[in-house]
Amino acid sequence: MSISVGLGSYLLVGAMLFCLGLYGVFVKRNIIAILMSIELMLNAVNINFIAFSRFAPWANPGTNPLIGQVAAIFVIVVAAAEIAVGLALVIAIYRNRRTTNVDEFNWLKW
């Protein structure tokens, strides 16, 4: 008995992971948890890129299209830069305010 996993299965996993990250962004109040949720969303996009690259109509067995893999690596690089800048900002804010709770960030209001 062989079970084949198609494009729909990968897209379902990607959508579930994206929804989980989106839920974390909207519900969590800690900046670090929000950054982790954004990383989940970016990884869901990577899963979709790789799945579309694998199951695309132009992906013949004899060819090796790397469009999805290159896009996924690009998203990983952007995510690494985003997390580095985000954590630097979190550390700077924590040193000044002694909190990482987003509900207490009202110093940009007039």
Swiss-Prot record:
Topological type in the membrane: Multi-pass membrane protein
GO cellular component term, pick one: plasma membrane
- Sample GO molecular function, one term: quinone binding
Query: Which keywords describe this protein according to UniProt?
Result: Cell membrane, Membrane, NAD, Quinone, Translocase, Transmembrane, Transmembrane helix, Transport
Location(s), subcellular: Cell membrane
Biological process GO annotation list?
A: ATP synthesis coupled electron transport
Where are the coiled-coil regions? none
- Where's it mainly located? membrane
Superkingdom in the source lineage: Bacteria
What EC number(s) does its UniProt record assign? Answer: 7.1.1.-
**Reaction catalyzed:** a quinone + NADH + 5 H(+)(in) = a quinol + NAD(+) + 4 H(+)(out)
Could you confirm whether the keyword Transferase appears in this record? no
Q: Does the keyword Lipid biosynthesis apply?
A: no
Spans through the membrane = 7-27, 31-51, 73-93
Q: In UniProt terms, what function does this protein have?
A: NDH-1 shuttles electrons from NADH, via FMN and iron-sulfur (Fe-S) centers, to quinones in the respiratory chain. The immediate electron acceptor for the enzyme in this species is believed to be a menaquinone. Couples the redox reaction to proton translocation (for every two electrons transferred, four hydrogen ions are translocated across the cytoplasmic membrane), and thus conserves the redox energy in a proton gradient.
Q: Subunit composition?
A: NDH-1 is composed of 14 different subunits. Subunits NuoA, H, J, K, L, M, N constitute the membrane sector of the complex.
Its family remark reads: Belongs to the complex I subunit 4L family.
* Descriptive protein name: NADH-quinone oxidoreductase subunit K
Per the UniProt entry, what species is this protein from, by scientific name?
Desulfitobacterium hafniense (strain Y51)
**Gene assigned in the entry:** nuoK
